[in-house]
Amino acid sequence: MKRVYFIGIGGIGMSAIARYFHARGFNVCGYDLTPSPITDQLIKEGIEVHFSDDLNMIPKAFFSPTDSLIVYTPAVPADHSELTYFRSNGYRVVKRAEILGEITLIERALCVAGTHGKTTTSTLLAHLLKQSHVDCNAFLGGISNNYQSNLLLSDKSDLVVVEADEFDRSFHHLKPFMAIITSADPDHMDIYGTAENYRDSFEHFTSLIQSGGALVLKYGAPVNPRLGSDVSLFTYSSDDRQADYFASDITIRDGRLFFTWHYPGGQLEEVELGVPVHINVENAVAAMAIAHLNGVTVEELRSGIASFKGSHRRFEKVLDTERVVLIDDYAHHPVELDAAIRSVREIYSRKHIMGIFQPHLYSRTADFYQDFARSLSMLDEVVLLDIYPARELPLPGVTSRLILDLIENPNKTLVSKNDLLDYLHGNEIPDVVLILGAGDIDRLVIPVKQYLQTLC
């Protein structure tokens, strides 16, 4: 095999694998629906990308079934013409998760799964390993602010950190050496149907952990592990002392967050968290646990936690001036929304906070609109955008107004993406602006930042 073609190359997970093959000398190119910062960067790195579902746009060298591998994301429609062509003409066509699964067979995989927190936890775990004597490879679900990439490579370590995606049961293709499960709050009901099926999927994932490995499970998570007899089980918590790993003495001093990390047989005091947000303490406890189990020393843990800079779009402070603060977050599930808003409230307790939220998927909005409204009601001002459909067709009666009508705060409005900047121009700007969502709202972050900078 000499060539790898990606259908949906601009996705965060797909782009990491594309970079992996490109770094190893394969001829790589791909398709995506629209240009994005990720596709722009891939093109700069020498990977050809086109944006039309058109076989004529694919380089001729890729029309060789014996030499070309086709990788696609489940978000691509089944009737996509390029995907249909390759399936019908003898090519090996695989999902992104299948490729990751093959990589986890030849490397010692540290897989991070969960409804929430897996991107921050996996990125932090990778950083802890990378800056230590252990080192690692990593396929991340976000762009690390420390490395400005979602792919980390090592020429000396056989450890690979993998963000394990539960959508479409993708993580069932993986073969973890060790794993973290951060949470199992029901999501993707269009795939799973029931909360029981969703949690069962996580339980099956635990059965895939290899002999001699370990599971680090959030204490109290509704998951009954199905572990082999020689797979170790540990629990973790941000503050519950019943867990094997936990934090205590969490304090914020002059904008810096410190805690004591407890582990079996000892504790590490005065650990400073580089991204001083309370919700990241729990993620840090889990990442430190797996890193420690794989040989990272406690002093390496201390320095790694302090130097961690977070991930793009994970409670990322994009602008911080005396006049206004702009924070960008990927939150798209009610629990994530609640955590992000509470964190902003904790940090900026006396400030006027505006939230700009783009719901993601019609199905998720239909399932959770009441919970979304409850979380958004904690804001001083709410700006709702239309639902980002991604892979879905509209559902009758399901619009952002379902959420809007239930938000208790009367200071709320519904605007289109195209009208957002006009809305901001015509209204008083709050002290803190929080951008929330997993769709294409990220394309508005820079324009909003540029507008806010004109006020400073």
UniProtKB/Swiss-Prot annotation:
**Protein name in the entry:** UDP-N-acetylmuramate--L-alanine ligase
Entry EC no(s)? 6.3.2.8
Q: Which GO terms describe its biological process?
A: cell division; cell wall organization; peptidoglycan biosynthetic process; regulation of cell shape
What is the recorded function of this protein according to its Swiss-Prot or TrEMBL entry? Cell wall formation.
Q: Which UniProt keywords apply?
A: ATP-binding, Cell cycle, Cell division, Cell shape, Cell wall biogenesis/degradation, Cytoplasm, Ligase, Nucleotide-binding, Peptidoglycan synthesis
Q: Which gene encodes it?
A: murC
Disulfide linkages recorded for this protein, renumbered to the chain, are none
Note whether Nucleotide-binding occurs among the keywords: yes
Molecular function terms from GO: ATP binding; UDP-N-acetylmuramate-L-alanine ligase activity
Q: Which residues bind ATP?
A: 114-120
Cellular component GO terms, alphabetical:
cytoplasm
> Where does this protein act, in terms of pathway?
Cell wall biogenesis; peptidoglycan biosynthesis
Family, according to the entry, reads as follows: Belongs to the MurCDEF family.
What does the UniProt entry say about where the protein is found?
Cytoplasm
Q: Which InterPro entries match?
A: Mur-like_cat_sf, Mur_ligase_C, Mur_ligase_C_dom_sf, Mur_ligase_cen, Mur_ligase_N, MurCDEF_pg_biosynth, UDP-N-AcMur_Ala_ligase_MurC
